[in-house]
Regions:
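ABC transporter nucleotide-binding domains
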Residues: 2-4, 11-214, 220
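C-terminal coupling/interaction segments
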Residues: 270-306
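Non-catalytic surface loops within mature trypsin-like serine protease
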Residues: 15, 35, 241-243, 271
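ABC transporter nucleotide-binding domain
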Residues: 180-269
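Short, surface-exposed acidic/glycine-rich loop or hinge patches that mediate macromolecular interfaces
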Residues: 73-74, 218, 242-244, 272, ...
Length: 306
């Protein structure tokens, strides 16, 4: 059973005052997300990512189509007890402390006072919020600190699936690494994570599958390795070598493009069956092989090509 199943989901907005017109924010989107995966949802500003999340959370309502989460139609309010959600720009009560906010969210899910206190302490520690700030009012928090509190509240009900809209927003490099580790640990626990992010390097490190949205329509979806394969030549390989200079290697190498780099020579070949010729040339010239791997386009290249 898919963790999330989206079928022909469409959302139109009316804009204008005197002369109203419809703008299609999401156009016939269909997706299926397996349980236990980290799924990356990408797109430029205005592509429809946040609209999709708001539709799944029932904060807004679709013009057409349907969706199911954990086997239940999104109209089934009981489903919300099993999910966690961090919006892109969360707003919290300024005069609550971090501890009070998380305990309040736990109370909404029916936890006892003892359970609420323990859950709040466990989660604030898990998101690595400095314990000295647990009883500080949220109005005194930085953007990154508020983001950590938002992550804590999204996990208060021990959800089976977590929806995160720009979870790295406002975090410094150390904070991003800690949140990446947290998200990876959720997958290790068997949870499903649906995350939107503009930070492509984080998506590349974390996600099992991705989808790219363009102007409200699905442009690409699939496993990262499959999407990053070069469409013009999916069998291209890269050999990194040291211990030999480019001029010497060119005298004996009959195929392959040689490029000097700080790490050594980068040799590109267009087919796997050409590797033996490269290895033979390196042995003949005294070179050493550092690595052999397929050449894949980066996620940034894939994103920009859409």
């Amino acid at each position: 059973m898919p963790a999330v199943e989206i079928i022909n989901l469409t959302k139109d907005y009316e804009v204008g005052f005197w002369r109203k017109r419809k703008v299609r924010a999401l156009d016939d989107l269909s997706l299926s997300i397996d349980e236990g995966q980290i799924f990356g949802f990408l797109g430029a500003n205005g592509a429809g990512k946040t609209t999709t999340l708001k539709l799944l959370m029932r904060l807004i309502f679709p013009t057409g189509g349907s969706a199911r989460i954990l086997g239940h139609d999104i109209q089934d309010v009981r489903m919300h007890r099993r999910i966690g959600y961090l919006p892109e720009n969360p707003y919290f009560y300024d005069y609550l402390t971090a501890r009070e906010l998380v305990e309040y969210c736990a109370e909404l899910f029916g936890l006892t006072p003892v359970e609420r206190r323990k859950r709040a302490a466990d989660l604030l520690a898990r998101v690595k919020l400095d314990e000295k700030r647990w009883d500080t009012q949220l109005r005194k928090f930085s953007k990154g600190m508020l983001q950590r509190v938002g992550l804590a509240q999204s996990l208060v009900n021990d959800p089976e699936i977590v929806f995160l809209d720009e979870p790295m927003s406002g975090l410094d490099p150390v904070g991003r690494r800690e949140v990446r580790d947290l998200i990876a640990s959720l997958r290790d626990e068997g949870k499903t994570v649906f995350m939107c992010s503009h930070i492509l390097s984080d998506i590349e490190v974390l996600c099992d599958r991705v989808a790219i949205l363009k102007s409200g329509r699905l442009a690409q979806a699939g496993y990262l390795d499959e999407l990053r394969a070069r469409p013009d030549d999916p069998h291209q390989m890269e050999v990194m070598a040291t211990g030999v200079d480019a001029a010497t290697l060119k005298q004996v190498l009959t195929n392959g493009q040689i490029t000097p780099t700080p790490r050594g020579l980068r040799i590109e070949i267009s087919a796997e069956n050409e590797i033996e010729g490269v290895l033979a040339a390196l042995r003949k010239t005294g070179g050493k092989v550092v690595s052999v791997q397929p050449i894949k386009q980066s996620l940034e290249e894939l994103f920009m090509d859409q």
